[in-house]
């Protein structure tokens, strides 16, 4: 990972140390090779489904899926895509909660490879550094662009921000609809799943925790 940014390496190391990194096999193939291999295998899957790839509507589907997997919905598996992070010295001595609400996210359930669609609320109490607000959204999006379970996704965002900001005072909450529940199995179209991960004062201080939870509209 020598070509990665310092921030990407720090976050990856922190997640590995805590056993919260997405399970990976090791050194990945270069993107173009991955796309070619996925296209080959997806062609076979579609044939096994008895689809006729000579039809002009289906002919390019294996290639489209391969490109989508590598470049888009699973791009967060590659730390070279980790967002460029802007950290600013906390010269104003901000010591109150900073909250970004309703961050849209789309991820993929790693059990069935169907959509997870939700929103995240992220808060932190600055110490020595503050982060550009859009970078919080980008970090949420980066970890969403992987096969995921919502519990791990919530914790990965928390650990990433704690690592970058140099403070434990971070909180993350995610509300999401899981299409593995909505579109198959029980086929429940109305239920949502909420996960919360709290650090520092958000865990130890009841007042701070309640203030955060009020921003998520859970209490």
Curated annotation (Swiss-Prot):
Record flagged with keyword Cell cycle: no
EC number: 3.5.4.16
Major enzyme class: hydrolase
Alphabetical keyword list: GTP-binding, Hydrolase, Metal-binding, Nucleotide-binding, One-carbon metabolism, Zinc
HAMAP family: FolE
Family: Belongs to the GTP cyclohydrolase I family.
One biological process term in Gene Ontology: tetrahydrobiopterin biosynthetic process
Pfam families on file: GTP_cyclohydroI (PF01227)
Top-level lineage group: Bacteria
Binding-site list for Zn(2+): 109, 112, 180
Subunit note: Toroid-shaped homodecamer, composed of two pentamers of five dimers.
GO molecular function, one term: GTP binding
Name this protein carries in UniProt: GTP cyclohydrolase 1
SUPFAM superfamilies: Tetrahydrobiopterin biosynthesis enzymes-like
Gene this chain is encoded by: folE
Catalytic activity: GTP + H2O = 7,8-dihydroneopterin 3'-triphosphate + formate + H(+)
Pathway(s) where this gene product acts: Cofactor biosynthesis; 7,8-dihydroneopterin triphosphate biosynthesis; 7,8-dihydroneopterin triphosphate from GTP: step 1/1
UniProt keyword ATP-binding, yes or no: no
Organism from which the protein derives: Photorhabdus laumondii subsp. laumondii (strain DSM 15139 / CIP 105565 / TT01) (Photorhabdus luminescens subsp. laumondii)
Gene Ontology CC, one term: cytoplasm
């Amino acid at each position: 990972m020598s070509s990665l940014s310092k921030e990407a390496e720090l976050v990856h190391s922190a997640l590995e140390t805590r056993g919260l990194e997405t399970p990976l096999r090791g050194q990945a193939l270069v993107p173009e090779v991955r796309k070619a291999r996925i296209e080959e295998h997806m062609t076979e899957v579609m044939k096994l489904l008895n689809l006729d790839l000579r039809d002009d509507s289906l002919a390019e589907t294996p290639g489209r899926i391969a490109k989508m997997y590598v470049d888009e919905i699973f791009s967060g598996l590659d730390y070279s895509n980790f967002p460029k992070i802007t950290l600013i010295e906390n010269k104003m001595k901000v010591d109150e909660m900073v909250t970004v609400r309703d961050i849209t996210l789309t991820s993929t359930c790693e059990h069935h490879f169907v959509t997870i669609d939700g929103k995240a609320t992220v808060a932190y109490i600055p110490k020595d550094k503050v982060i550009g607000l859009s970078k919080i959204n980008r970090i949420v999006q980066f970890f969403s662009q992987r096969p995921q379970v919502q519990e791990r996704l919530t914790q990965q965002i928390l650990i990433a921000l704690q690592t970058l900001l140099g403070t434990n005072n971070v909180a993350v909450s995610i509300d999401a609809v899981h299409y593995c529940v909505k579109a198959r199995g029980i086929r429940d179209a109305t239920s949502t799943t909420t996960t919360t991960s709290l650090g520092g004062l958000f865990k130890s201080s009841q007042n701070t925790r309640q203030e955060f939870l009020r921003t998520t509209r859970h209490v």
